[in-house]
């Protein structure tokens, strides 16, 4: 017989995606009221159930209000057994689990949540997938909340049990690799060995001083052009000297995947999934990735997604190489101990996780996990059903939106998750505890909530102390969410841990102990287009001694976004003087308020219909306040934080001409993709980050012309820029025009 337990979400709640929860959980949820239903199998007889139901309606009761009744209906022996179970489970050494278990354990010891607290745990650990209704969402939940209350990322087994299972799995026989990595020829051709095990302490000390302490300038080592791919690359090397990469590894390989130094199981899985060949572009990307060089790659459009299989391949190859190296060294040490000899073999970090993948949404995470499963060569996957429930949904975006919008917000677009993945000989396990995981997949928001818990005693960052490969995918989507969370992750990654988690110091590499891990961490960043924040991630916050490569698409006037608008609207580019990037916001505001606003209506042939597009929210607030305090214009302002009623009302009044001027932010456009009616003239306060937005904004005017609300010859769009906007301008007008706009004597240019 089953009974239902309803509880309100609180500080002890555990949300899906492995995300961390704190006492300010409701603020994270943007104030949404949540009520979850948990059903578990009752072990009492019918009489006890009837007695219990007499205290409530249909067996439903509130945990906090009916604790006493719950205690009276629990058998003493069952209570003691479950308490012992909880104590054993509470030993699991995992960041998210620890935070949850401390709260639950304290409440159980004080008698506040006796049976019900254990019931929730037993639902996850005992019934598991046997009872599909064990943990479910309330039917009235929004789609955005689907699966948020699942214990994603939480491990309820004892850590010792995990280690024993892993040891048993490691002891099983495995087919030997064809190439022995321990031979001199193998070492000289193995980028993994050269990058992580060969650098000497003296070399790393020297580079630590130059790169980290003195912040010496990196050198441009090589520039290459791939005309047939409309692509260029710039390779930078660190000050001093970079890690020596043999010519055999630097020589450009072909499109046959067998030419690349991959573990046999990864190569076999890749070949069976994607075939034996890769494209020329993929070969150009894969080689430096496998050489552990940093990559900053602009894939230009969401349709170009083939690079993802390359970093999934690399992540698995790295994990398997690490694992095999540790196993071989362990066997060597065991043999030497039997012979009475002594040897120092260092092959580990402080903690197990080696790869961190940052992604914007759960749907993006689901896509990568599915790809990794295909390439892993594992026979079985644990907790796959649970993962699919929390990370995958068939919900589709509206088809009247642009393709890139549909791609960004398809499926489960929840941006709050952090999940561990553990790989053994035959099994890929999802929801592994962070400290026993090989790969961590997270949104910056989900991970930062673990790293910077408001309660300092509960903060956990040790599990990312030994990350050797950092991958940031769909960086533009992450930036539109909140780039501050990425900065938080970069603050803690490769930081020496607070505790050492039973680490074997005789096996830890010296560069980890000496706090030099960041000098060898590889960073891979993939984005549609480059922004200062994304570029800074590789140029300033990555210190990989193997070098950095920036790939950049070639945008000409012919394939630029301006050339694809299809409307002969007057487009004016107005340059203002700016001394430095730091002074740019103030210089822009001064120019705008002194030169643009006073003649705003006079410059228009119409008394209304002026849109001012502002990418930065801080610039938007500044301009909005100026309009309010220093002008008499009848204006409206809408942004990503505006209520739906205000958005609807302001757009309607602007379309009718009741509002002369409307202020419109870039993030609002990104998240909603409105087609604003009534736009007759357009001012872009800063060049749009996404070149597609430039085209969409210009077409607002085209829509008004089509409706015969204005004349094509009397409309215009004006873009305000400085020389520091060169990259954004290049995406709009092409690489031939952008230098002219930024450095010539004329300050104003007109295009049609």
Swiss-Prot record:
* Record carries keyword Transferase: no
Q: Name one GO molecular function term.
A: U3 snoRNA binding
Which residue intervals are annotated with compositional bias (Basic and acidic residues) in the record?
A: 26-53, 65-76, 102-118, 127-136
The UniProt entry's sequence similarity note says: Belongs to the UTP25 family.
* Subunit comment: Component of the ribosomal small subunit (SSU) processome composed of at least 40 protein subunits and snoRNA U3.
Record's function text: DEAD-box RNA helicase-like protein required for pre-18S rRNA processing, specifically at sites A0, A1, and A2.
Identification of the protein by name: U3 small nucleolar RNA-associated protein 25
Q: Which organism is it from?
A: Lodderomyces elongisporus (strain ATCC 11503 / CBS 2605 / JCM 1781 / NBRC 1676 / NRRL YB-4239)
